Design a protein with these regions (language model features):
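Serine-dependent amide/ester hydrolase catalytic core
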Residues: 1-38, 88-89
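Structural helix-boundary/capping segments
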Residues: 38-90
């Protein structure tokens, strides 16, 4: 298993997101996840911390082809041990 950041930063504000074209936003925010998706590898994203703006920061767990069970097992372990706060949905 390989653990990487899921993104390079927390989520942009709507104004920041709309200030760049889709290709630029994709390059910035999908940098870590896109290659894994294109390779067809199993992966899961798990929140582990809140940013200074109280937005989730996540890690990505990448597994071997066909071993979703390993990815989900580690994701569950991290989820149970990190105790990430539940967010209030508006």
């Amino acid at each position: 298993l390989l653990v990487t950041p899921a993104t390079l930063c927390d989520a942009p504000s709507m104004q920041d997101f709309l200030s760049s074209d889709n290709r630029t936003q994709t390059a910035k925010h999908d940098y870590c996840t896109q290659p894994v998706n294109l390779a067809g590898l199993p992966a899961a994203t798990v929140p582990v911390k809140l940013s200074s703006r109280s937005l989730p920061l996540c890690i990505q767990i990448i597994g071997r082809y066909g071993r979703e069970d390993e990815v989900l097992s580690l994701a569950k372990f991290i989820e149970n041990n990190v105790q990430f706060p539940r967010m209030q949905l508006i």
